[in-house]
Amino acid sequence: MSLPSYYITTPIYYVNDVPHIGHAYTTLACDVMARFKRLDGYNVLFLTGTDEHGQKVEIAAGKHGLEPQLFTDQVSQNFRDLLPALDISNDDFIRTTEQRHKVAAQVIWQKLFDNGHIYRDKYSGWYSVRDEAYFTESELIDGKAPTGAPVSWVEEESYFFNLSNWQDTLLEF
């Protein structure tokens, strides 16, 4: 009897800068788990990759005088090159700009939307691009995020995941 499949993934890393020790650490931790599970007979799928969207990426590309896609192509390759340098045993490397990712994301999004798990609403608040986080007025220090990053007031419509639909399931977990 074969053991069940085991799926493990690193975060998909933002390509706004070169890889650093934190990227190496999380990738190595996933690699250790993937290797252990393989030795234990599991059918492992170990995924890593890069997230090539967002304000941080757009800003970083602009600072380098490059179009975002060219910039992400270059930086994503740095992340890909890290894997053999660390002898990482990943099975796949995904880029959010790849067609296969776009199609899968759209299918999942549509299923969630059709089942009432995603809804559209408005939000506003003090946002830090660097921290990728919102802060309340009381959290700001001299008009900046607690990390010292600049913030700007943002008001926009967005989609939200209806987490309350999953409350009972999560509490039982």
Give residue ranges: language-model regions:
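N-terminal, positively charged nucleic-acid-binding surface of large information/translation enzymes
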Residues: 1-173
